[in-house]
Amino acid sequence: MHRATLLALALLAPFTTLAHDIPQWHHRRSIPSKRAIIDSSSLSDSYDYIVAGGGSAGLVVASILSEDSNVTVLVLEAGSSGDEVATRRGKHHSMLYKSQLHPGISWTSSTTAQSNLADRVLTWSRGKILGGSVEIDAWASLIGDEDYWNWDNFYNVMKTIETFTPPTSDAESVGDITYDTSSNSDSTETGPTSCQAAGIEARKDPHGGENWGASNLAILPNATVVRINWDTSSSNIKAKSVVWQESASDSEHTITVNKEVILAGGVIGSPHIMLLSGVGPSSVLSAAGINVVLDLPGVGQNLQDHVGNGINWATTEATMMTIENSGSDFSKTAEWLSFISDAIAYVNLTTLMGDNMTNWISTVRNEYTASEAWIPSTDSTILAGYKSTFDVITQTYYPSSIPQIEILLSLNAANTVTIQAALQHPLSRGQITLNSTSAFDQPQIDPGYFSHWADRDILRAAFKLVRKIAAAQPIAQYLGTESSPGTSVSSDDDLNTWMNANVHTDYHPLGSMSMLPKAQGGVVDKYCLVYGTSNVRVVDASIFPMSMSSHTGSPAFAVGYQGATLIRGINNGVISTTNSSSSSNASSSSGSTTSSSSAATTSNNGATSVHLSAWGAIATLFLGCIMV
């Protein structure tokens, strides 16, 4: 076994919770010649569904909606199809993060100067490519009324979006391949077997053959959504068309929507489109000179993100990057390209704070009134929503086993071992507003890092734990001098100064279009419908109202699946939204983010109708979401 492999395996030992082994396919995919991708000359004048954003959630939404053959679906993606960078897929999975710096496939947005981080401006990369941010991610996978959004249902959705085909005997003969079928349905066995019995050959190469697009699905790359045009004749405004451009110098193009517009532009893109369309906080719209079509204070608010950094140690052993940089024959082998070299652990507050935890939590809670001063909006509904999420974090998350810190081992530098720590449930909140009225100018992004002092306290305790891990065997035998920040940085004040100058985003922002009651600053209801509209939904990670103890890739796929399933059910008359407290103009709230809900299922003309009784906290979904 290669020496770097031995080192990586040895380094895993101190971690109590490890990442599931995720197969890393090293084959380069051939580019399919027949897909749903079109150019502007093939556009129709109208579509039933227009999906703004072809990322993790948007493509799932489009795929599911197009399963109804009697509807038409259009995806407008600002980025390219990705064909021009397809050959880069041969790289080791942990090297893909370098593509974040590639302006052709990444939005290199910048934050405002962060006053609590030594006035630094941070880069926020996200995928500018069909497929979204998962196309530039460095990690492969992670793992509440009618309870579409509770843990059990959402976990089932996360399992549904993952598929597995057992290896053939030919593949099994190459190595010892094992797998667990306990979570699979009977169709995984009966389906392929029946197909083979009917004369359909099973392919040995999962990437072989040609992909054919659905005839009722069109995907248009290099199409930036400029705004939504509204019909304001009713109490709930209705999207009547979507305007897009290929570039800032291109003329505007308008496409009529027959049924619904689904925003899937992500945490930055979705609120940006809404603001440019005249929907959002009236103060933000008026300041930008945009006509206020609908005053919805929550648009762009409640922004939150994982923030972290790493401590580095020198090592004389070869690391992943040592091999990558060598250009050796081994660095090009399937063994290397499919090798997983990271380990991960999640740590709760009890482990971080020890006996001081109870008093520390009391201090945080007793200073809530001061916490409101750090929220960028003074709107009463935004403050009410923050109070609700603040209570969940400080009353439920903090004293429980729910992790507050992610610890990640990284070998991404030559002859260097890095142990990273990242905050999982920040109390700090930011916002997305406008820099200009152009869709081609990035909006103003202010994540408000460390605006609440508790976030800095937790992360500082995490770095102290990182040093304890590094001193434990067997990892200690491989580590030399601490190269950054160095052992001289040891006091709380010194660590604070170092963090302010060095922490960075973990690229897991969410919350800017939160699924909360309107009275708590919410933007969408439990059906993903934007309050005050009749046919605009948001289906992406921006609707999650609270950060989770996980990466956001898999949840983004899952929210796309769940959102599209709801949209299909509603438009096909299977799901009823009548008598729901989450209707698009609902504004009342219990004032709590945790409430029970019940489901009643009745028969209505042969169809199943589901009636939702009360809004339940989507936040409860994440109480156990600590999988990677």
PLM ranges: what are they?
Residues 257, 606-607:
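Long alpha-helical scaffolds
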Residues 3-587, 591, 612-627:
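N-terminal redox-cofactor-binding region of secreted/periplasmic oxidoreductases
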Residues 593-606:
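Juxtamembrane low-complexity tails/linkers enriched in Ser/Thr-Pro and polybasic
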Residues 1-6, 599-601:
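Intrinsically disordered, low-complexity Ser/Thr- and acidic-rich regulatory segments
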